[in-house]
A protein has these predicted regions:
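DUTPase catalytic domain/fold
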Residues: 1-146
Length: 146
């Protein structure tokens, strides 16, 4: 598992804010938007953060919804989690969707999502004729009951 003490962040916009954790024990870094936006019910928008990052090899970024925004307004990340590969150097943008009943107005500087850094592995894939048995087997959706 990669251990890093610093993450390189490039500010692409004069109003961009460094991602920040609200409390010392928080896992996610809040991402803020740099422009106002309006989301009518059912609409999606690609919202800029004004940031780019250089993730080290072995770490990926997951863009996750903010629970309060989803609970209070029905606004969440449409492709949650959004994946940031370590070789991506472009602007971090968040696909927000309004699942609520009311129009949502975002303001520059609002916290719109969270960035979670996670280790990943990329093993070589091998095609097999049979998979090993498991206790669950092929039991899928709804198989564990209510």
């Amino acid at each position: 598992m990669p251990i890093v003490d610093e993450l390189e962040v490039k500010l692409l916009h004069p109003d961009a804010a460094l991602p920040a954790r609200t409390r010392p024990g928080d896992a996610g870094y809040d991402l803020r938007c740099v422009e106002p936006f309006v989301l009518r019910p059912g609409e999606r928008a690609l919202v800029p953060t004004g940031l780019a990052v250089a993730l080290p090899p072995g770490l990926a970024g997951l863009v996750l919804p903010r629970s309060g925004l989803a609970h209070r307004h029905g606004v969440t990340c449409a492709n949650s989690p959004g994946l940031i590969d370590p070789n991506y150097r472009g602007e971090l943008r968040v696909v927000l969707v309004n699942l609520g009943r009311d129009t949502y107005r975002g303001h520059a500087g609002d916290r719109i999502a969270q960035l979670l850094l996670v280790p990943y592995w990329a093993p070589e894939l091998r095609v097999v004729d049979e998979l090993p048995d498991s206790e669950r087997g092929e039991a899928g959706f709804g198989s564990s009951g209510r």
